[in-house]
């Protein structure tokens, strides 16, 4: 039986921290689905198709990784995709408290789905998509924070929105 895991998130945009977790999950599981939440309460910079495209672009070196979008409950999506594990990255203790609540309700909704917490690499412990967008918005380099394709997409996005 294939070991399938889901790495869920908004990925707006995908960062080197996300990619680190995805690569490590890909080394453990037979298949990893990077699942982009469609109906997030956040107002995204990149639409779902753009985010899926960026994820696919930066994971081409990982043959067992795919990208997909989902709406609704994550555990229902996991069951549809026959995934037994949800992989979540943790940056700090503050992440753990929130993630533990989500993992607990997911377990209550579907006892067959486990949540695996992975500590992020310490060089990415401060990193979030929000921080990346804030830095990029002001024209500063994010080359050490995101893959090159994402940096290019951010530059284009902010040039368009600033009218340059």
UniProtKB/Swiss-Prot annotation:
ATP binds at residues 10-11, 18, 89-91, 99, 124-130. GO terms for cellular component: cytoplasm. It is an enzyme of class 2 (transferase). GO terms for molecular function: ATP binding; pantetheine-phosphate adenylyltransferase activity. Homohexamer. It catalyses: (R)-4'-phosphopantetheine + ATP + H(+) = 3'-dephospho-CoA + diphosphate. Pathway: Cofactor biosynthesis; coenzyme A biosynthesis; CoA from (R)-pantothenate: step 4/5. Its EC number is 2.7.7.3. Substrate binds at residues 10, 42, 74, 88. The gene is coaD. GO terms for biological process: coenzyme A biosynthetic process. The record marks 18 as: Transition state stabilizer. This is Phosphopantetheine adenylyltransferase. It is found in: Cytoplasm. Belongs to the bacterial CoaD family. Reversibly transfers an adenylyl group from ATP to 4'-phosphopantetheine, yielding dephospho-CoA (dPCoA) and pyrophosphate. Its cofactor is Mg(2+). Keywords: ATP-binding, Coenzyme A biosynthesis, Cytoplasm, Magnesium, Nucleotide-binding, Nucleotidyltransferase, Transferase. Gene3D superfamilies: HUPs. Signal peptide: none annotated.
